[in-house]
Amino acid sequence: MFNLWIELAKKYKIILLEWDLWAGKTLLTKWFAHWLWINENIVQSPTYAYLNSYDDKLLHIDMYRINTEHDIWEKWLNDQISNHEYIAIERPNFIDSLDISNYVTIKIQKDWEKRIVDILE
């Protein structure tokens, strides 16, 4: 899975992460951070903070609590996105309201014994 993540990061600036709770969204972002020479031990889930920024290299957004398009503007998400080299967005609600291009969507479903991965390029 780590190698898949890195190959996608070479092609896309923005990776949208759509999957269940506890399926590994933040873990994948930690792998991505490691690839960018960011200490993966400092990468945390942004669920309650909306976003975590790691220098200008990586922006990690969780849109779980974004309830309206207005929330995107109120949180300055488009400005934040334009200031970072790579962006990982968990649960990308209202994605059409974000000023983004060059992205890929990774959907992961948890099964009792495995994870099912779909990549939408």
Could you say what each language-model-derived stretch is?
Residues 53-86:
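Mid-chain, well-packed structural core segment of small domains
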Residues 70, 78-121:
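Short phosphate-coordinating micro-motif centered on Lys-Gly-acidic
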Residues 1-9:
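N-terminal pre-Walker A segment at the start of P-loop NTPase domains
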Residues 21:
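The conserved Walker
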Residues 15-17:
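Hydrophobic anchor at the beta1->P-loop junction of P-loop NTPases
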Residues 25:
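Conserved lysine of the Walker
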Residues 39-54:
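Short beta-strand-centered segment that lines the nucleotide-binding/catalytic pocket of NTP-utilizing
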